[in-house]
């Protein structure tokens, strides 16, 4: 056993040391012939009929690449959602602009000591705001009718404190309320009775006294505004005049303002006089 491998070639030495059991499978004549390099490595040349599937273990690089791909998909989904939300926001904004109608505004400048002028409609004050570079605040009013959205802004002019600037926003959707005739004792020279008869707004006593002192004609503030408002309301002026006249007569008769003077009431019954009147 000590002389084993002495004088043997390198391929035989490697064969006997590394694979001692190969002699059982090969002939003795194999020692005489050179052995190939693949035989030295112990790799058999025959190929199996069925090759098993190769399952490679997951490496850190493959897992990281999958994570990166997942992040990219999430980012794309987030960008798509943001794009959709932006489109929806733009669409709603454009629809709001289209549905929002322009409200007409009309402004009047009137010389008056009274800030809130009587224009024939009923208003409710809902706010007050200071005006830049002006010591006079701005007052905000709203029409008291439930289905009417007309607003009014009243402020005194900074350049001319004796003038009042009234701005109307919108158009009334209802007729003006009927005006009540003044009581007995009021002088017709001030023009209040004639203004109420033709449908113009009655001004407060303070403003009437101020107008009489200044000897000015009645302002066109009420007439111009009312004419613009009544253009959008369809009604018959003659019928309205008759109704106002009959209601005014009933009010005067009920208050006892119309009295019979002289002896005519002793001869003719009172109901005949009322019918002829």
UniProtKB/Swiss-Prot annotation:
Its main location: nucleus. It is found in: Nucleus. One of its GO terms (cellular component) is nucleus. It holds the Pfam family WRKY. One of its GO terms (molecular function) is sequence-specific DNA binding. InterPro entries: TF_WRKY_IIc, WRKY_dom, WRKY_dom_sf, WRKY_plant. Residues 69-79 have a biased composition (Acidic residues). Keywords: DNA-binding, Nucleus, Transcription, Transcription regulation. Residues 58-67 have a biased composition (Polar residues). Residues 112-177 bind DNA. Residues 84-96 have a biased composition (Basic residues). Residues 51-96, 183-206 are annotated as: Disordered. Belongs to the WRKY group II-c family. Transcription factor. Interacts specifically with the W box (5'-(T)TGAC[CT]-3'), a frequently occurring elicitor-responsive cis-acting element. This is WRKY transcription factor 68. The gene is WRKY68.
């Amino acid at each position: 056993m000590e002389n084993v491998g002495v004088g043997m070639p390198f391929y035989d030495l490697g064969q006997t040391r590394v694979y001692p059991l190969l002699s059982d499978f090969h002939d003795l004549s194999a020692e005489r012939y050179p052995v190939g390099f693949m035989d030295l490595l112990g790799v058999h040349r025959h190929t199996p009929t069925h090759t098993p599937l190769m399952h490679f273990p997951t490496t850190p690089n493959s897992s990281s690449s999958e994570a990166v791909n997942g992040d990219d998909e999430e980012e794309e989904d987030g960008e798509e959602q943001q794009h959709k939300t932006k489109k929806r926001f733009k669409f709603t904004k454009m629809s709001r602009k289209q549905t929002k109608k322009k409200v007409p505004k009309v402004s009047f400048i009137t010389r008056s000591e009274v800030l809130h002028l009587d224009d024939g409609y009923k208003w409710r004050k809902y706010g007050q705001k200071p005006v830049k570079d002006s010591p006079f605040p701005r007052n905000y009013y709203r029409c008291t009718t439930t289905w009417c959205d007309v607003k009014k802004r009243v402020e005194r002019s900074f350049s001319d404190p004796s003038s009042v600037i009234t701005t109307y926003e919108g158009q009334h959707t209802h007729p003006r309320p009927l005006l009540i005739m003044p009581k007995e004792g009021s002088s017709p020279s001030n023009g209040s009775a004639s203004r109420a008869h033709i449908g113009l707004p009655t001004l407060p006593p303070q403003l009437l006294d101020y107008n009489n002192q200044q000897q000015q004609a009645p302002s066109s503030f009420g007439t111009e505004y009312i004419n613009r408002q009544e253009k959008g309301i369809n009604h018959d002026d003659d019928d309205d005049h008759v109704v106002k006249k009959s209601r005014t007569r009933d009010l005067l008769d009920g208050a006892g303002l119309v009295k019979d003077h002289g002896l005519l009431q002793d001869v003719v019954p009172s109901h005949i006089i009322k019918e002829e009147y």
